[in-house]
Structure formats: structure tokens, C-alpha cells
Regions:
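Bacterial N-terminal signal peptides
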Residues: 10-20
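Non-catalytic beta-sheet/beta-sandwich ligand-binding modules that flank or precede catalytic cores
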Residues: 25-294
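Bacterial N-terminal signal peptides that target proteins for export
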Residues: 2-11
Length: 294
């Protein structure tokens, strides 16, 4: 059935291996550019919390979390990769517009599990109602640490971020240059070609696909714009010659470049990719982070 296909996609974006057939997408709304709040910094932060589905996780979600069927899903993106051993449900609180406070039923880092990707945590539970009492804040209330992959381990405790509403489309929240040693994927996602000279990972607030449920292709590749910045300060916009990290159902894409000029920013135009709720992306822009700056 159509609704099963749609919601299995959402789970598939957050759980490796579940596939989707079709998806019914809503129409693109008025144009606006969503500027990611990411800047190179050593301080921990929450980059986004995205209300993905409301009371709609499918029955198969019980394989991940007993009782997840018909619950809500909120992916939260962190500034640094997370230490999975410190990840607990009680680390999180979700506040609703009406003043309710909820603790997730369960949390998971899957399926974004390649090196450098483990910064998206999916919260599953009852987090209000999209119409009458939507979730508005995600807060870290326990000792949740980064994994120290870049710099020393950092504590996210005390941080919070506003929840993107259910009917808003997904935006870019992070772009980072990937060290060449990490270009190869450990999961089923596709790799950038060996002739790549630079690879930029972009992270979306939630899972994104085409409106028909398929992965992005050459058309979408040509819509990505990477701004390169030369040593003299001049800039040039280029298009990636290939896309990587496709087919693994997470919220990351790899932009494969044939230039070694440092990438400065990434943008993507509105109305081409949809989230699990069928909402189209807005115009979106994010500055590129070099992991050596973190």
C-alpha cells in the first residue's frame, strides 16, 4: 500500500536496509533561502532538530524500538560526531508548544554510520501533535559526549535547539571537507570516483530523496553549487562531477570535485528534494567546515 511505502522510506533513512517504492510529495512553497547556522568552531552545538513524521512510524519500526509503531520521529544533527557509548534516551527532552516535556522512547545513530557521519541522532517517541501542540525545542539534559574524533571529547549537556516544523522542507545544515583517508564508504553507499581531488560531505536536516522515492541523479548533481575560494580571495562556483554516498538511506551526500581549490560554501535550489513527509526543500546554503578547524 502507498502509505506503507512512504513511511518505510522514513524508517529506511534512519535504519539501514529498509527500502521504499513511491512517495506522494506536496507542492513546493514560496522561495526562501535557509542559511545554515554552521560556522567553523570548537564549541559543541546542535545544528538542527527536524520534525520528520507525526504519529506515523510504521509497524516495522518495532524492530528498532519496541513500541515505535505510530510514534513521532525527530532527527537531531550535532556539530561533532557522537560517542555512541554515551548516548541514552534520558539525555534528551522534547518540549512542546503547550508546555509538555517528553523523553524519547528510544534513540539511534543509524543509518549514518560511516566515519565522520555519526552526528545525526533519531529520536522516537510521543512529542506532541503537529497541529495542536507541536514540538518546539529539543534539549540535552544528560552527559552526552562527542567521540573525540576531532579534538578532545566535548559535552553537549545543556544545549538546545528549535525544532523545524513538520510541514517545513529539509535544509542543508553542515558541509565539511572529508580527509582522503575517509573517502571510501564502510556501508553500502556509493564512493566518489578515485580521480576526485576533493570531497565535500553535505548533511541535510533530515533524509532527502526525489519525489518519486528515487535517489538523486545527474539532474540533482548539476543543481549543487560549490563555491571555491582562491588564495587571493576571489571565488568561483562549480558543479560536482559526481555524487557519492547514495543508496545507504542516510541524510548525507558526498560532492565529488575535480579541483583542489578549497571549497568555501555549498548551495542547493528549492523544490527538488523531499523529506519523508513529502515537503520540498527550500533554497539552502551552508558554509564549508574544514575538520582541522574543529
Amino acid at each position: 500500500m502507498r502509505w506503507i511505502s512512504k513511511y518505510c522510506w522514513f524508517l529506511g533513512l534512519m535504519i539501514v536496509s529498509f527500502m521504499i517504492g513511491g512517495l506522494s510529495a506536496t507542492e513546493a512553497g514560496p522561495k526562501q533561502t535557509v542559511m545554515a547556522k554552521t560556522t567553523p568552531t570548537q564549541k559543541p552545538s546542535l545544528l538542527s532538530a527536524f520534525f520528520g513524521l507525526d504519529d506515523s512510524l510504521p509497524f516495522i519500526a518495532n524492530l528498532l524500538c519496541l513500541g515505535a509503531w505510530d510514534k513521532d520521529g525527530i532527527p537531531v544533527v550535532f556539530s561533532h560526531t557522537v560517542n555512541p557509548d554515551s548516548l541514552q534516551t534520558e539525555d534528551f527532552q522534547v518540549l512542546t508548544r503547550g508546555g509538555g516535556v517528553a523523553t524519547p522512547l528510544c534513540v539511534t545513530l543509524r543509518p549514518a554510520s560511516d566515519v565522520g557521519e555519526t552526528r545525526t541522532v533519531l529520536l522516537i517517541g510521543e512529542f506532541g501533535n503537529a497541529v495542536s501542540d507541536p514540538p518546539v525545542i529539543v534539549r540535552i539534559v544528560g552527559d552526552l559526549f562527542s567521540d573525540g574524533a576531532v579534538g578532545r571529547p566535548l559535552n553537549f549537556s545543556g544545549l538546545e535547539t528549535v525544532v523545524t516544523p513538520l510541514n517545513a522542507g529539509p535544509a542543508l545544515v553542515l558541509a565539511e571537507v572529508i580527509p582522503e583517508s575517509n573517502w571510501s564508504q564502510s556501508t553500502p553507499g556509493t564512493d566518489c570516483p578515485r580521480k576526485s581531488k576533493q570531497v565535500v560531505r553535505v548533511t541535510w536536516a533530515g533524509g532527502v530523496r526525489l519525489a518519486d522515492g528515487e535517489e538523486p541523479g545527474d539532474t540533482e548533481r548539476e543543481l549543487y553549487r560549490i563555491t571555491l575560494r582562491y588564495p587571493d580571495g576571489s571565488k568561483e562556483d562549480v558543479v560536482p562531477f559526481a555524487l557519492g554516498d547514495l543508496g545507504d538511506r542516510d541524510n548525507n551526500h558526498h560532492l565529488c570535485l575535480d579541483s583542489q581549490i578549497p571549497a568555501y560554501a555549498v548551495s542547493f535550489p528549492s523544490g527538488h528534494l523531499v523529506d519523508p513527509n513529502g515537503d520540498f526543500n527550500p533554497d539552502t546554503w551552508v558554509q564549508v567546515v574544514d575538520v582541522s578547524d574543529l
